[in-house]
A protein has these predicted regions:
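Structural motif
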Residues: 49-51, 166-179, 229
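ATP-dependent adenylate-handling active sites, centered on carboxylate activation for C-N bond formation
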Residues: 1-155, 194-241
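Globin-like tetrapyrrole-binding proteins
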Residues: 184
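PAPS-dependent sulfotransferase catalytic core
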Residues: 242-258
């Protein structure tokens, strides 16, 4: 599944890869009109509000798959178990001492809010607050002003139990734990289950098998994220069976043009 905007579509790349592997490829591009028209049906099948636009992409992907199969295999869990998200990797700025990032954040709080200032503000927070705030729209002080109440649940309080449990673990393991406990189980798997069932097909997620998890949790940090490369162990395993440009490819994810 892809969209009209090239940066939101891997259809051409997928076609090239499947041709090299002699695998049948079926794809479909979704227009803006189709996307918007599907909103009400997607949220009907979700049974609850969701702010994740990829639910609609999975809806269309499931619709396409349902024309030929009744059961599909999906890759959910690989990123959370093996370190697949780019946010797991430290860049130049996040490697700066915390007191410098905190000072920069204080300055940016009084500047007009944009993508850059919000990034600097978030990186000036402790991990317990900064990581869970990656996709949020409002910071706590802004939310307090909008809601006009004081007793709302803060993001850091939602995930406090995970950080308390993993307080002696390294930074990467803490982020993985948060994503497994909340992002994977409460969002991703829910979306895949409901969107496939909306088209009367079933999804199987082999990466979430307990034996796979036990292997992943024993891997050292550099086998997950190292020098800008994510999912190191999986890439090394895949290099034996897929072309170099495939296992070296930077992760795009499943973005939607919203």
């Amino acid at each position: 599944i892809g969209f009209d905007l090239a940066k939101y579509s891997e259809i051409d790349y997928a076609k090239d890869l499947t041709d090299k592997l002699n695998i049948k490829n079926i794809s479909e591009k979704i227009s803006k009109e189709e996307y918007m028209n599907a909103l009400s049906e997607v949220y009907y099948h979700m049974d609850e509000p969701t702010a994740d636009g990829c639910a609609i992409a999975v809806y269309f992907l499931s619709r396409l798959a349902s024309k030929d199969v009744k059961v599909v295999l999906s890759g959910e869990g690989a990123d959370e178990f093996f370190g697949g998200y780019n946010s797991y990797d430290d860049n130049f700025y996040t490697k700066l001492p915390f007191f410098i990032r905190k000072s920069m954040a204080s300055i940016c709080k009084i500047l007009p809010k944009n993508k850059i200032t919000r990034y600097i503000i978030r990186r000036g927070l402790p991990l317990e607050e900064s990581y869970v705030s990656i996709n949020r729209t409002y910071y706590d002080d802004e939310l307090k002003d909008v809601l006009k109440i004081d007793n709302y649940i803060k993001n850091k309080d939602i995930v406090k139990d995970v950080y308390d449990e993993y307080k002696d673990y390294n930074k990467l393991d803490k982020m993985l734990a948060v994503d497994i406990r909340y992002w994977l189980s409460n969002n991703i798997l829910t979306i895949v289950d409901k969107m496939t069932m909306a088209h009367s097909i079933e999804s199987r997620v082999p990466f979430t098998d307990m034996k796979v998890f036990e292997v992943a949790r024993m891997l050292p940090k550099n086998y997950k994220v190292s020098d800008g490369t994510t999912k190191v162990a999986l890439r090394n395993a895949a290099r034996k069976v897929i072309p170099n440009d495939a296992w070296k490819k930077k992760k795009l994810g499943f973005p939607v043009p919203i």
